[in-house]
Amino acid sequence: MNIIKLSLFLSFFTFILSGQTSLNQISNDISNNALLIYETDKDEAILLSRQALVADPSNAYAWAVAGNILRKNQEFKKAENFFKKSLEFNPLLKEGLYWSAENNISLDQLDEANQKLKILINSCSGCNESVMLKLSLDKKKAQTNSNDVSTKDN
């Protein structure tokens, strides 16, 4: 009798886990579609990114994508909340770190962006995200230095 109960429990548990995995995959697919259509239909991309969060509210990638779409839409403050949620679920998600740091740069929060760069370098030193973020930070620093020099000249 105990073996039957254990078998039923394990079967049910396996069923639940397989359902969660498929919801996660659906959420990822919806998020990827949102990124793909952003340039042609911003409103639809925003709706899709929200649907991805409904499909799996604990999907760090979906939160990062939703934040990135807001960032691209220049809604930096709103985007920040989505990136925070993404990094709560997965503090090493390279897309979450990269897009969040780009958002920090847009908000002139260079210390936060540099912290995320350090995490990216430690977790995926050769990945595209760490290289692109380093370039973005260098560009922002050059702009800041150039502005400082032109201000001093006046």
Residue ranges and their predicted role:
Residues 39, 72-73, 106-107, 136-143:
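Register position in tetratricopeptide repeats
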Residues 51-52, 85-86, 119-120:
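Canonical positions in the second alpha-helix
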Residues 55, 89, 122-123:
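Structural marker of alpha-solenoid helical repeat scaffolds
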Residues 65, 99, 133-136:
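Canonical tetratricopeptide repeat
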Residues 114-154:
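Terminal, low-structured helical/coil segments at or just beyond the last alpha-helical repeat
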